[in-house]
Amino acid sequence: MVEGSELIDAYLAGAELLRELVQDLSSEQLRARPVPGAWSTMEVVCHLSDSEALFADRMKRVLAEDRPALQFADPARYAAALAYHERDAEEEVAIIASVRRQMARILRSQSAGAWDRVGMHSKEGERTLKQLVRKAIDHLEHHLTFVRAKRQALEESAEQSVATDGAGTTTFQS
């Protein structure tokens, strides 16, 4: 499918962008909350993984059913109930990548008219397949901004914890 090829490529690229941002973080860094009042990086990764499964389900249902109902999922309830800090970041990113690869294959196999198929979202109303794919792309990119900010805050915190004593010796502050 030529029409949606660029959209599918952008959709596929998201998982690798996330992987690059989190792959070198320690468990402690993933679970830290360097930005007051915000989720940890681990919570963001788990939220993205859970959301990815929902986005894929919605896309599949729009392709397979006539005007299916697409339910809203409350991210705060998912975060509270689904053990985000007990999960594994590498596994969660792999789930996102796997789901996106599967969906990309499905999307590439569709006719051009499939992009206009619709579902009825419980809060957002009518949504086309194209809008659902774009939402999945935008959602991940939106959260990458927060992951970058958390990384920056962690780096700044680490820099502030390094001090030099009077003899020129570097010491680490806790």
Residue ranges and their predicted role:
Residues 1-4, 82-89, 125-129:
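A short, mixed-charge helix-start or loop-turn motif at secondary-structure junctions
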Residues 1-11, 172:
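Terminal targeting/low-complexity segments that flank the catalytic cores of oxidoreductases
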Residues 4-8, 65, 104-106:
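A broad, low-specificity signal for short, low-complexity segments enriched in glycine/proline
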Residues 10-14, 19-21, 77-117, 136:
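Acidic/histidine-rich alpha-helical segments that form the ligand environment
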Residues 31-75, 104, 116-174:
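Short, contiguous alpha-helical
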